């Protein structure tokens, strides 16, 4: 590994120590449907976001709820203390498209229609309000 590449890798590693996030990869839901759920909780306090996700009728909300609980646990693990009520917020959440499986469906007159089974990757960041104020 070159010197510049090693330095940038070390900087990236140091930056990750102060970020609290969780990733969910290869979720078999279309990114469009998952983004609807992500938009519901973006910027919310985590306890309120958990309540919104728990009572949402969308199938993707259960997966995002589990991801949010994982991000909270990651924050608690790195800070070595429990998160207090109203302390943590969902700072960023984004949904990227994953691999698309292409399948064929029989159609009239010997043709075949292509079915695209989409998947996505979700990345969720949480942080405390005090560190958000310092960054802005």
Swiss-Prot record:
**Source organism, top-level taxon:** Bacteria
Q: Kindly list the biological process annotations in GO that this record carries.
A: translation
Q: Does the keyword DNA damage apply?
A: no
**Keyword rRNA processing on this protein?**
no
Q: Which Gene3D superfamilies match?
A: Ribosomal protein L22/L17
One Gene Ontology cellular component: cytosolic large ribosomal subunit
Name of the protein this chain belongs to:
Large ribosomal subunit protein uL22
Tell me its family: Belongs to the universal ribosomal protein uL22 family.
Q: What does this protein do?
A: This protein binds specifically to 23S rRNA; its binding is stimulated by other ribosomal proteins, e.g. L4, L17, and L20. It is important during the early stages of 50S assembly. It makes multiple contacts with different domains of the 23S rRNA in the assembled 50S subunit and ribosome.
PANTHER family from the entry?
CHLOROPLAST 50S RIBOSOMAL PROTEIN L22-RELATED, LARGE RIBOSOMAL SUBUNIT PROTEIN UL22M
């Amino acid at each position: 590994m070159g010197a510049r590449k090693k330095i940038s890798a070390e900087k990236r590693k140091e930056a990750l120590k102060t970020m609290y996030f969780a990733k969910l990869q290869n979720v078999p839901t279309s990114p469009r449907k998952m983004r609807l759920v992500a938009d519901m909780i973006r910027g919310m306090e985590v306890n309120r976001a958990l309540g919104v996700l728990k009572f949402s009728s969308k199938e993707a909300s259960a997966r995002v709820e589990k991801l949010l609980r994982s991000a909270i646990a990651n924050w608690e693990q790195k800070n070595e203390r429990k998160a207090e009520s109203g302390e943590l917020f969902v700072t960023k959440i984004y949904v990227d498209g994953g691999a698309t499986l292409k399948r064929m469906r029989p159609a009239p007159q010997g043709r075949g229609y292509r079915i695209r089974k989409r998947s996505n990757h979700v990345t969720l960041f949480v942080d405390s309000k005090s560190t958000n104020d310092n960054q802005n």
